[in-house]
């Protein structure tokens, strides 16, 4: 959509423009049998024209009456505006802009906008090639002329998505993706939508994204729609249909490996009784391995569950990747021999590296392959679920680290004590050596000092005689 603007430049009074639109609609409908729109609204337009020509400022009560009469005129004009889709291609945009301008002068524009958006979401017979782009341009104008907090934007946005969905316009959807990623959540909060409207909006985005070929965005918004279902509605038929759609998408889309958003959904949990086989398959993909999957499909063929047989290869490949992720997360030594991987995945040994690389690309593990040692050294592995067994594994690893740290601390403590002992011994030895050297030096000084004092006294005595 274009940069937001609240300006739509059209000159003329309400009565003049409404009369012009009525004549134009009557012209388009000239081959139809309906009565004249202009004739229907003429009495109300005469009253409005008198009030518009009055030089006196209308009082509050008069202003309310003006708005009421405008609304009555607009009810007839907006219903008749469905004919604008048959207008010549060059005139469609101008005609709808006139409708938008008139609607904005009503007491409640939101009363009319959903119907206008519904018209714009339908094809333009006069412009089969450029009709969708014209409709998107007009809808963008409506969206941008509304205040950001106006919840009428919700209906306009649904119409934009409907046009993209019906035309499979990849270019239009790509232009919208940035706003979907950056602004949709804030729009939902600003428009103050209830759960049903939030669900409807996310499903509209999901459908448009799927038509445009963006399966990942489509799946993400299906999950968001699923999460918008209130617990009180989780067992309804609509919730069950959406839950089945989300679950089948998660199983068959090759990029989905995290099933937590599904298992935490009340609507999905209700499938435990409504779709027991499908729910059991989800539990296998969420936390089990290839062995459990192969046992399951022996007793419950994929063809018996919503045509999943068509995706049998995708399901098996995904299960192999998930099994390898579980294997990497549970190995205590962080080293996975090629033979162990080959056995767990039911694949030839020479294919091990391919499957490890696929699992790395899926973001489930990180590590280093060693062809020389025939092993995969795990640097990081993602737990598919985190329950009692995983906590036990973490506890075991923490105990190993604790013992290792205790051993390191023991070595450090021993070395510290040894260092202190050696330091004390060295200090004592240095002190003892210093005492012995001092004693020898003192005796020599005394001997030298005694001879020096006797000489002078003898000289003094001789000199005295």
Swiss-Prot record:
Say if the entry is tagged with keyword Cytoplasm: yes
One Pfam family named in its UniProt record: PCI
- Look up the record and report any one GO term of the cellular component aspect: eukaryotic 48S preinitiation complex
**rRNA-binding is among the record's keywords:** no
Recorded coiled-coil stretches: none
Sequence ranges of Basic and acidic residues compositional bias: 433-448, 455-465
* Alphabetized InterPro entries for the sequence: COPS7/eIF3m (IPR045237), eIF3m (IPR027528), eIF3m_C_helix (IPR040750), PCI_dom (IPR000717)
Q: Name one GO biological process term.
A: formation of cytoplasmic translation initiation complex
The transmembrane residues are none
**What is the protein's known function?**
Component of the eukaryotic translation initiation factor 3 (eIF-3) complex, which is involved in protein synthesis of a specialized repertoire of mRNAs and, together with other initiation factors, stimulates binding of mRNA and methionyl-tRNAi to the 40S ribosome. The eIF-3 complex specifically targets and initiates translation of a subset of mRNAs involved in cell proliferation.
Protein name, per record: Eukaryotic translation initiation factor 3 subunit M
């Amino acid at each position: 959509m274009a940069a937001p603007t609240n300006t739509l430049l059209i000159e003329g009074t309400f009565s003049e423009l409404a009369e012009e639109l009525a004549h134009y609609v009557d012209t388009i409908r000239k081959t139809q049998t309906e009565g004249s729109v202009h004739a229907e609204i003429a009495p109300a337009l005469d009253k409005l024209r008198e009030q518009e020509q009055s030089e006196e400022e209308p009082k509050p009560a008069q202003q309310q009456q003006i708005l009421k009469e405008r609304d009555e005129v607009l009810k007839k004009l907006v219903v008749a505006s469905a004919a604008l889709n048959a207008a010549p291609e060059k005139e469609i945009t101008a005609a709808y802009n006139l409708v938008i301008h008139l609607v904005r002068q009503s007491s409640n524009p939101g009363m009319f906008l959903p119907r206008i958006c519904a018209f714009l979401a339908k094809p333009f017979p006069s412009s089969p090639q450029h009709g969708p782009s014209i409709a998107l341009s007009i809808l963008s104008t409506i969206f941008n002329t509304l205040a950001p907090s106006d919840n009428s934007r919700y209906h306009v946005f649904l119409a934009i998505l409907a046009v993209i969905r019906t035309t499979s316009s990849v270019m239009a959807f790509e232009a919208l993706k940035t706003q979907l990623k950056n602004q949709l959540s804030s729009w939902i909060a600003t428009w103050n939508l209830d759960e049903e409207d939030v669900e409807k909006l996310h499903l509209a985005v999901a459908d448009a994204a799927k038509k445009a070929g963006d399966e990942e965005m489509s799946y993400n918004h299906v999950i968001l729609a699923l999460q918008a279902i209130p617990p009180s509605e989780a067992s309804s038929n609509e919730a069950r249909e959406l839950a089945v759609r989300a679950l089948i998408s998660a199983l068959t889309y090759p990029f989905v490996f995290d099933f937590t958003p599904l298992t935490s959904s009340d609507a999905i949990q209700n499938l435990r009784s409504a779709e027991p086989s499908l729910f059991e398959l989800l539990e296998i993909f969420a936390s089990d391995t290839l062995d459990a999957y192969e046992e399951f499909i022996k007793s419950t063929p994929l063809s018996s569950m919503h045509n999943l047989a068509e995706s049998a290869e995708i399901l098996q490949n995904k299960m192999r990747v998930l099994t390898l992720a579980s294997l990497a997360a549970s190995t205590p030594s962080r080293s996975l021999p090629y033979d162990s991987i080959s056995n767990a995945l039911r694949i030839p040994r020479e294919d091990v590296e391919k499957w490890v690389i696929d699992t790395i690309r899926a973001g489930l593990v990180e590590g280093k392959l060693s062809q020389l040692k025939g092993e995969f050294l795990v640097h990081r592995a993602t737990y598919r679920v985190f329950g009692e067994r995983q906590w036990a594994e973490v506890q075991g690893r923490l105990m190993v680290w604790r013992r290792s740290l205790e051993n390191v601390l023991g070595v450090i403590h021993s070395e510290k004590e040894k260092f202190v002992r050696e330091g004390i011994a060295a200090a004592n030895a240095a002190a003892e050596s210093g005492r012995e050297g001092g004693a020898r030096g003192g005796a020599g000084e005394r001997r030298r000092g005694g001879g020096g004092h006797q000489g002078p006294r003898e000289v003094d005595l001789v000199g005295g005689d």
